[in-house]
Amino acid sequence: MGQEPRTLPPSPNWYCARCSDAVPGGLFGFAARTSVFLVRVGPGAGESPGTPPFRVIGELVGHTERVSGFTFSHHPGQYNLCATSSDDGTVKIWDVETKTVVTEHALHQHTISTLHWSPRVKDLIVSGDEKGVVFCYWFNRNDSQHLFIEPRTIFCLTCSPHHEDLVAIGYKDGIVVIIDISKKGEVIHRLRGHDDEIHSIAWCPLPGEDCLSINQEETSEEAEITNGNAVAQAPVTKGCYLATGSKDQTIRIWSCSRGRGVMILKLPFLKRRGGGIDPTVKERLWLTLHWPSNQPTQLVSSCFGGELLQWDLTQSWRRKYTLFSASSEGQNHSRIVFNLCPLQTEDDKQLLLSTSMDRDVKCWDIATLECSWTLPSLGGFAYSLAFSSVDIGSLAIGVGDGMIRVWNTLSIKNNYDVKNFWQGVKSKVTALCWHPTKEGCLAFGTDDGKVGLYDTYSNKPPQISSTYHKKTVYTLAWGPPVPPMSLGGEGDRPSLALYSCGGEGIVLQHNPWKLSGEAFDINKLIRDTNSIKYKLPVHTEISWKADGKIMALGNEDGSIEIFQIPNLKLICTIQQHHKLVNTISWHHEHGSQPELSYLMASGSNNAVIYVHNLKTVIESSPESPVTITEPYRTLSGHTAKITSVAWSPHHDGRLVSASYDGTAQVWDALREEPLCNFRGHRGRLLCVAWSPLDPDCIYSGADDFCVHKWLTSMQDHSRPPQGKKSIELEKKRLSQPKAKPKKKKKPTLRTPVKLESIDGNEEESMKENSGPVENGVSDQEGEEQAREPELPCGLAPAVSREPVICTPVSSGFEKSKVTINNKVILLKKEPPKEKPETLIKKRKARSLLPLSTSLDHRSKEELHQDCLVLATAKHSRELNEDVSADVEERFHLGLFTDRATLYRMIDIEGKGHLENGHPELFHQLMLWKGDLKGVLQTAAERGELTDNLVAMAPAAGYHVWLWAVEAFAKQLCFQDQYVKAASHLLSIHKVYEAVELLKSNHFYREAIAIAKARLRPEDPVLKDLYLSWGTVLERDGHYAVAAKCYLGATCAYDAAKVLAKKGDAASLRTAAELAAIVGEDELSASLALRCAQELLLANNWVGAQEALQLHESLQGQRLVFCLLELLSRHLEEKQLSEGKSSSSYHTWNTGTEGPFVERVTAVWKSIFSLDTPEQYQEAFQKLQNIKYPSATNNTPAKQLLLHICHDLTLAVLSQQMASWDEAVQALLRAVVRSYDSGSFTIMQEVYSAFLPDGCDHLRDKLGDHQSPATPAFKSLEAFFLYGRLYEFWWSLSRPCPNSSVWVRAGHRTLSVEPSQQLDTASTEETDPETSQPEPNRPSELDLRLTEEGERMLSTFKELFSEKHASLQNSQRTVAEVQETLAEMIRQHQKSQLCKSTANGPDKNEPEVEAEQPLCSSQSQCKEEKNEPLSLPELTKRLTEANQRMAKFPESIKAWPFPDVLECCLVLLLIRSHFPGCLAQEMQQQAQELLQKYGNTKTYRRHCQTFCM
C-alpha cells in the first residue's frame, strides 16, 4: 500500500433523495451522518500508477444532526461551492477549498427532506421540508421566498436545467407537481399516476420533446394521466420530458408540454444467482434515476436488490434495458441504491457514482457499464483493530454496524480491498483477535456477549461459542491452555486457547476445537492455585506476554494482576491506576535489548499511561505475590480516558495510545517524551494499531465511524491538545447533582424532568435497542449520548428549535399558565371558598345500589305498575310467562321478591359499578352475596385487590388466603410497591421470596434488614445480599458504604480494597487501618505506603510518618521518609527546592551544625530507636528488595527525591554497619539517578551532604584491596570530580549565580549536547584577545586561579579513563547508526510521498522543488559524516561497535561514568580562556582522547577545533 494517508469514511446516509453529488474535474461528495466527505476522483488522486484513482481528501463539519441533502454548484467558476441541508433545520453553503461555511439560513420550521442547487441560477438553492414548505434562497443577495404548494410531505425536488423558474417536486403520496417560482409557486402541472413515494426526479438533459421518438398512443392507463381539474394549466414553451421513480416499482416519463405521462417502465424482477426473490423486496425498494447528459435516449435507474439498469428510451414498446456489470459476478451492489450522480474527470472520462445500503460507494464507467472501483465505508463505531501475524497486512476492523471488515492493506491493485463478514454476528463487534499461527482464523466478540471464530478464507458461517458473556465482550486473547483444558494429552487439546473478557468481569477460556462445549471461568483456577478467599476483582482486560508464559489481568479497581503458567500463580499485583483498566499491551520480543520484552504498558479511565518493567519479578518468581506501586515510566499528556495502547514492532520502546480526548499520541516510552499527535478524528478514539510493515504508519478507529491510516512523519503536533483534566470534569459532574434530589421532590418540577428524559436519553436508548436494522437507525449509535458534554454550549438550542413548555402541577392558590403563540401569560384564579375541607366532608357517599334507586324515582304510573307486578308475583299461585318476564324486566324488584331475583339485581348493579370505574363498590356487593372467593378471583384477574379484601380472605379458608396474599404481592410488584409486596409475603412466611423480591429490585437495605431479622446468621443468602449490594455501591462510587457491606459479608480484604479505590490520603489510611485490624498485614502495608506517598505530595510530613507507623514492616520506609524530610528542609533552607511551601515538618531537634549524616542518624536514634547493628541490618534488608526504575528528564521532582533518598538511606545504613561496599554502590545509584534526570544541583547537594570532604574518606574505608565496589567507587569519584569541574568552569566564566534554575538548565544542555555550549570555542581560540581574562575581573581572582586552579585542575585527570571513553564511543556509534538507519527510512518515505503527490497535472515544478531539499539534505549529511550512507557500511559499523562493547568487562559496563570526551572539551575550553592553567600533559591526553574517540557526530566538529 502506498505511503499516503487513507480513510475508511462513515457510510453515506440512507433514504435521502439527494445526498451525493459531483462536479466536473473529479470532485465527489456524499453526506455521512452530520458531515459531508469529499473524494478526489480521476488522475492525480491515486498516489502511484496502477492504484484506484480516488482519495478521501476532506470533510465538511458544521451540522449538529444528520445531513439530509447535499448538492454542488454546477456553474463554471463555482465548482468549489456546495450546499447542505440537515435535520438541525439549517441550510449551509460551503467553500470546499477552505472547508468553511460561506453563509447559511434556518428558514425551515420542520425537518428538511431535500434540496437542489439550480443549474440555471448561480446563487439559487431550493429546499423542501416534510410539511410541504419550499424555500428559495438567493445567497448572493441574502433573499428568500416562502412557498407552500401542497400540505404533503416532500420527498424530492429538482430544478429544471432549461428554465430557471421551473421546479419539479415529488411527494410522499405519489403526486408530482411542476411549479413556477416566479409566480409565487403557481402549479404548472400536477402529474398523477404514481401511488407511492416519489424517490427521484430527473429532467431530460435536452430541451424540447423532439429528442425522443416516443409513441403517443399509450395504454388506457396512460390516457387517465391528466392534469388537475382545479388548476389552470400554463403550457411550457417547447416542453420537456421529465422522469420520475417511485416506490410503486415504476418509472414514468412525463411530457411537460401536455402535462401527462407518455411512458411507463416497470422494474423487472432479476433473479440473483443461487437465490430466489425476497417476498419483502418491495418494502426495501428505493428507485433513483439518472438521465445522462451525453446520452439523452438512455436512462439509468436502480432496481430491487442493488442492481443498476440502463433503459433504452428509443424502444419504449420493448422496454429494453441493460444490466450494469452483467458479465461480472459480485460487482453490483448487494442492497438497494439510494443515489446516482455523474462525474466527468479531468481526462474527460464519464463516470457514475452510486451509494447504497450495503455501505459501499461504487464508481461505474458509463462507456462499459463496469465497476471501476469501490470505496467501502463504516456504519458504526470502529471498536477494534487487529493485524494478522500470519497474513501480514490483513487488518480486521470490528464495527458497530454488525459487520467485520478485513482490509488487505498490502493490495497493489486496490488500496481499499475490504471484505465484509456479517453472517452470525448480528450485533456490534467490540473485540477482535487473530490466531497467532493459523491463517485466516479470526476470533470476534460482540456487545451481546457472543464469542465466535471466523474463517476469513471460506464462505462458511462462523463457529459460535455456546457460552455467552452476560455483557459486552471487552477483549479477546490467544494464550496457552490452563487447567482443566490443559490436563488432556498432547493431541487431545489445542496448542492455544481463546480467552474472552466480558463486561460482567469474568474471563472465560474457550476451546477452539470444541466451541460447542462449555467455556471455563479462570477465576476458579486462580482461587484454587493461590488459595484466595476474598472476592476477586472484576476483570476488564486480559493480555498474554508474547512468549505465552505470563498473563496480565486488568481490573475494574485499577489494579493489574500478573499470573504465571501453568496454574496461573499470582506473582505480582500492580497498584498504579485508580480507575478501570481499559488496555494492556506487552512490548514485542524482537527489540535490540532483550529486557524490553518485560515492559508492559497500561491505560485506564484516568488520562495517564503507565509502563512497568517486570523483568525482576518474572525472573525471580517470588513465592508470595509482590505489590508494585511505582511505575517504570509515566506518560502524561492526554486529557481523557485511555482506550487503547500498542507498541511499535519496528522500534524499541515506542508506543502509540488512543484516548477519549480525540487524539492518538506516539510516545518514546523510555524517555517519557511525546513524539507526535494525530488529530484527524472527529470523535473519541477507541482503538489503535501499528502497521506491521511500515514504521511510519498507524491505523486508528473512533466513534466518528472512521478508520484513519496516518503517518507519524506528517503530523504537525507533538503532544495532545491542552484541555481540562478528566478528573476535574468528573468532580464537577459529581458535585452538581447533589442538590437535584431535593428539587425533584417538588411536584412542580416532576413534569419537566420526565419530559427531558423522554426527549433525550430515552430516545437515544430506543434507537440503540432497535439494533442493526436496514433503515439507517444504526448510524446513530447509543454511545453518542456520552459525547454531549463535549459539544459546544450553543448546540443545545439548535437541536430543539421549538421550546417545550411544561405545565406544572398547580395547587388551588397557584397561578396557572396559558400558552399563546409561545408566550406565557399568568392568569389569576379566583380565591377559593372558605373551609373547603368541611364541604368535602359533608359530601354524600356514593350509593351502592344506584340503578335500583333511580328506578324507584320514576313517574307515579310506573311505580304503581311496579306494585301491581310485585303483588302478582308474590300472591299468584302459578306464575305465567308474562309475569316472569315482567319481574325479570324490573330487576330492581329483587329487594322485594326471592333470592334469585336479588342476586340478579346485585349482578346488574355490580356490572354498572365496574363500567363506571368503581370496583370497590362491586366488591362490596359481591361480599353481600357471600361470594368472597369469587370477589378475590375477580379482583385478582383485574388487578384490583386491596388491603381490605386480603384482610377478609381468611374467611374463605386458609388456602384461599395464601393464594390471595401471593396474588396481591404480584399486583403490588406491577405497581412498583415492592416493599409492601415483601411485607405481605412475610405474612405467609415466605421469607426467602420476600428477600429475593427486594434484592432483584435493588432494595438491598430493606432486604438485608429482613434477612438479618428472620434468617440464621450463617445463611448464605445474607452474605449474597451484602456482596450484591456492595458491588452496586462500588460501581456507583459509594465506597464507604460498600466497605460496610463487605465487612458484613466477612470479606474484610474486599472492604479494604474498595475503601482504597478513592485514592485520597484519608481513604487510604482508613483502608490501611482496616486491613491491619482484620489481619491483612501485606495489604495494610501497601496501603499505608500509598497513603504516605499521597501525603508526601501535599508536604504533610507528619501525616506521612503517622501513616507509615501503622505497620511494623514499613520501618525502613519511615527511615527513607525521615531522610527525605531532612533533605527537603535542607534544600528549602538553601532555596534550592522548586518553591517554598507551607510544609508541616516535624519538630525534630537536629540542629544545624555537624555533618548531615550525623544529624540523620541522631534522629533515627532518638525517634526510631535505631541504634544496634542488628536493627540497621534488619532495616537494610527491608529496603534492599525495593527497586525503583531509572530516572529521566521527565521524572517528577517529588518522585525523584523519594527515589534518591531511598538510595541514600541504604548508603547511611551501610555506613552504620561498616559495609562500605554497599555504601558506595548506594551512593552511586543516588548520584546517577540525579545525573540521569538532569538535576545537577541535587547531585551536588548529595555530595556536599554525604561527602563534604570528597571521596578520600571512602577510599580509606575500602582500603587498597580490589573489592566488588572498586569500579563503583571509581565511578562515584568520577561524578564527584565531574561536578567540581563544572563548578570550576562556571566560576571562571562569570560570578557563580545563585539561581538554581540557570545551573540546572546549563547542565542539562551540556549533558545532552555538549556542542551547544562549545560552539564559541573556535572563534575564541583563534582570537588572542579573547584568551585573556575579562577586563573587569579583579586581579586577586587571577592570582587565585593561578595558585588554586592548577592544583584543582590536576585532580581532574582521573576523568580521563580510556576504557570508559572507548565504551562510550562504541555506545554512541551504535546509537548514531540506529538513528541514521531510521533517518534513511524516513527520507525514503518522504521521497516516495513527494513523487506520489507530484503525479498530477501542472505539478512537475513542485515535484522538482520537493526533491531538491531532499538531495541537499542528504549531501549535507554526507559532508558532516564524511562517509557514504550505504547500508553495508552502516551494518559494518554497527557490528564492529557491538563486538567492541562485548569485549569490555562487566565491571566497566555495570556502572555509569561521566562522559569522558565532554570532560576533555570542558578542560580544553578552560585552557582557551586561561592558556597557562592546564598542564601540558593533561592537554595532550585530552586531545589524544578526542582524536581517538571523537569520530562520532556529536564530537567530530569540536575535535577538529581543539585538536588542530
Curated annotation (Swiss-Prot):
Changing residue 684 to A: Abolishes interaction with the isolated 7-methylguanosine cap that is normally part of RNA molecules. Residues 715-790, 1313-1343, 1389-1428 are annotated as: Disordered. GO terms for molecular function: mRNA 3'-UTR binding; ribosome binding; RNA 7-methylguanosine cap binding; RNA binding; snRNA binding; U1 snRNA binding; U4 snRNA binding; U4atac snRNA binding. Belongs to the WD repeat gemin-5 family. It is found in: Nucleus, Nucleoplasm; Nucleus, Gem; Cytoplasm. It is linked to Neurodevelopmental disorder with cerebellar atrophy and motor dysfunction: An autosomal recessive disorder characterized by global developmental delay with predominantly motor abnormalities, axial hypotonia with decreased or absent reflexes, gait ataxia and appendicular spasticity. Affected individuals have cognitive impairment and speech delay. Brain imaging shows cerebellar atrophy. Its main location: nucleus. Changing residue 73 to P: In NEDCAM; uncertain significance. Changing residue 913 to R: In NEDCAM; impaired function in spliceosomal snRNP assembly; decreased protein abundance; decreased protein stability; decreased interaction with DDX20; decreased interaction with GEMIN4. Changing residue 14 to A: Abolishes interaction with U4 snRNA. No effect on interaction with the isolated 7-methylguanosine cap that is normally part of RNA molecules. No effect on interaction with 80S ribosomes. Residues 739-748 have a biased composition (Basic residues). This is Gem-associated protein 5. Changing residue 286 to A: Abolishes interaction with U4 snRNA. Abolishes interaction with the 7-methylguanosine cap of RNA molecules. No effect on interaction with SMN complex. There is a cross-link at residue 754 (Glycyl lysine isopeptide (Lys-Gly) (interchain with G-Cter in SUMO2)). The lineage of its organism: Eukaryota, Metazoa, Chordata, Craniata, Vertebrata. The modification Phosphoserine is found at residues 48, 624, 757, 770, 778, 847. It comes from Homo sapiens. InterPro entries: Beta-prop_GEMI5_1st, Beta-prop_GEMI5_2nd, G-protein_beta_WD-40_rep, GEMI5_RBS, Gemin-5, Quinoprotein_ADH-like_sf, TPR_GEMI5, WD40/YVTN_repeat-like_dom_sf. The WD repeat domain mediates binding to U1 snRNA and to U4 snRNA. The WD repeat domain also mediates binding to the 7-methylguanosine cap that is found both on mRNA and snRNA molecules. The regions that bind snRNA molecules and the isolated 7-methylguanosine cap overlap at least partially. Besides, the WD repeat domain mediates interaction with the 60S large ribosomal subunit.
